[in-house]
Amino acid sequence: MIMMGKLKYKIQVNPEKTARAMGRNIPISRKHAREICKSINGMKLDEAIKFLEDVIAMRRPVLFRRHCKKVGHRKGKLGWPAGRYPVKAAKAILKILQHAKANAEYKGLNTEKLRIKHISTNKGITIKRYMPRAFGRATPKFQETVHIQVILEEYH
């Protein structure tokens, strides 16, 4: 059994004007999650959803600014040469954004005028597995997980 501590949101906001959602222990790459969150932070919600759908369809790359060693360049004037298409991470973050949008709709906020006020990633648990090999040895097969938190705000 895995014991999890309480994970709080990084910033405190007015609950009447914001909606939030959190995904815990999502089995995606921390580096990919960080780069996607950095790309969509501050965007309008509809733009961010369209951006992630384009990443999933491999029409638009995510710019890799920190984790960019040995990352190929992408064509087009993007403002940064290195980029990739992290499809698995984009699907997971898109799902969390849709949950946050549903929470905003439930609260009565105007879903057409929402922007991402805060989105961040935290390191989750590491799922440790071992693959048996010959002569009594074992190879570790660790899976990293990520916590993602999103706060949406209504703008005017």
Curated annotation (Swiss-Prot):
Belongs to the universal ribosomal protein uL22 family. Keywords: Ribonucleoprotein, Ribosomal protein, RNA-binding, rRNA-binding. GO terms for molecular function: rRNA binding; structural constituent of ribosome. Signal peptide: none annotated. InterPro entries: Ribosomal_uL22, Ribosomal_uL22_CS, Ribosomal_uL22_euk/arc, Ribosomal_uL22_sf. SUPFAM superfamilies: Ribosomal protein L22. PANTHER family: 60S RIBOSOMAL PROTEIN L17 (PTHR11593:SF10). The keyword Ribonucleoprotein applies. Gene3D superfamilies: Ribosomal protein L22/L17 (3.90.470.10). It holds the Pfam family Ribosomal_L22. This is Large ribosomal subunit protein uL22. This protein binds specifically to 23S rRNA. It makes multiple contacts with different domains of the 23S rRNA in the assembled 50S subunit and ribosome. GO terms for biological process: cytoplasmic translation. Part of the 50S ribosomal subunit. One of its GO terms (cellular component) is cytosolic large ribosomal subunit.
